[in-house]
Amino acid sequence: MNLTTRRTEGTTWKDIAAQVAAGSLKVGDQIEDELLTGEKMVYEVAHITEDRMDFISRDTMAERFTWNENGRNTGGFKKSDLCKALNEKVWEQLLPEELKAVICERECIQVVDGEEEKIMLKLWLPSEYEVFGEEWFSDAKEGEQLEIFKDPRNRIKMGGHGGSRARWWLLSVNGGYSTYACHVNGNGYASNNGCAIDFRVPLCFSIKR
C-alpha cells in the first residue's frame, strides 16, 4: 500500500525531506500540496537513487506550454522556452518557498544531433527513454527508465486536478527533425509534435537523500 501525505502546517516539506534522507518513502508514495495559485497538486515518488529521490506530479499543471515558440528544437531542452518557463516563471511564481528550499538540482541528459549533454536543473521533465525505456522518436537513450513508468498506467496524466486525459511534453527532441519534440499522448503512448504546439507538463523535481 502506498503512503499519501497531505502537506499541512503539521507536515512540512522539511519533514518530507527528512523522510527522503531516512529512506522512509517508496516509489508510488504521494504528497498532496498546493501551488501559490491554490491549484492542487499530488506529487508521486517516481524514482530513487543513492543520492536523490525524484518526484513527478500525478497529473499535469492546468496551464499549457509550448516547447519552443519559434517552432524549432535547436539547442535541445536546455535552450527551450519550456525549460525557461519551468525554471523561471513556475519556480519563481508558483512554487511555495518551503518546497523550493528542499529541491536539489538534478542531472538530466539531452541528446541533440547525436551530441550528448548533461544539464543541471531544479525543475525538469523526463526524457522519452526515462518514461518508456525505449527510443521511439528521440533516437537516443537519455538516462534510465524511471521506476514509476514501468507500469504503463502511470504514463497517463490528466490535465490539471480533475481534468481529462492530457498530452504532456517530454525533455527529448525528435531525432532527425528540427521542428519536433517528444511527448506522451492521452493514451500514455509515445508521440511527437511541433515545438510550437501547446501541451501540458507535470511538475518534476528532486530532493537530496
Which residues does each predicted region cover?
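Collagenous Gly-X-Y triple-helix signature in extracellular proteins
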Residues: 1-209
